[in-house]
Amino acid sequence: MITSEVFPLDGVERVENATALSFTDSSLDAIIMTDVLHHIPDVELFFAEANRTLSPGGRLIMIEPWRTGWSSWVYRNLHHEPFDTDVRGWRLPLGGPLSSANGALPWIVFERDRTKFIAANPTLEIVTIEPLMPMSYLASGGVSMRSILPGFAYPAIRFLERYILHERGAMFALIEVRRI
């Protein structure tokens, strides 16, 4: 496993630009990302790089923000990053590596514009899109806040998520793409 980030950090092995990866052709078995795709300024270049660097059968696995009625309200009213489902293209406005974002971009690419993604990436197959985490992310405090519930409440939250709120209220999706 090789860890990378867009800027130097302690404990991270490499600094990488997702649109110009330094890995050789077909050298990666997987690219695993959490909350990254919606920050990449040109995802079409990134998909070309993923296609180039993944070995046949290699996987691109992402956990990304996802659009549901619930998440749209949360992202638009309680989150600091833009969440614009109506943009026409996939490119982000110019900005810093963390400041430029559209939380709706994964949904736009893999749901709204799925046909475009498939046509533009014939050797990348969408394997799974699994909406998840309608409540646990918020209850945990997300990335930068404290948990609002005690740890013993987690099993009840997970029960509600699995059996009642699963896809309708998801905040994120697990997206798996395979290089053919």
Regions found by a protein language model. Give the residues of each.
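Class I SAM-dependent methyltransferase SAM/SAH-binding core
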Residues: M1-L21, A30, L45
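A short beta-strand submotif of the Rossmann-like class I SAM-dependent methyltransferase core
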Residues: A30-V36, M62
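Short N-terminal helix/helix-N-cap motif within the alpha/beta-hydrolase-1
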Residues: P41-L45, W70
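A short glycine-rich, Lys/Arg-flanked "PGG" loop and its adjoining helix->strand segment in the class I
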Residues: E44-R59
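Conserved class I S-adenosyl-L-methionine
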Residues: R59-P93
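Core SAM-dependent methyltransferase catalytic element
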Residues: T123, I164-I180
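C-terminal helical/coil "lid" or tail adjacent to the Rossmann-like core of SAM-dependent
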Residues: L132-R158
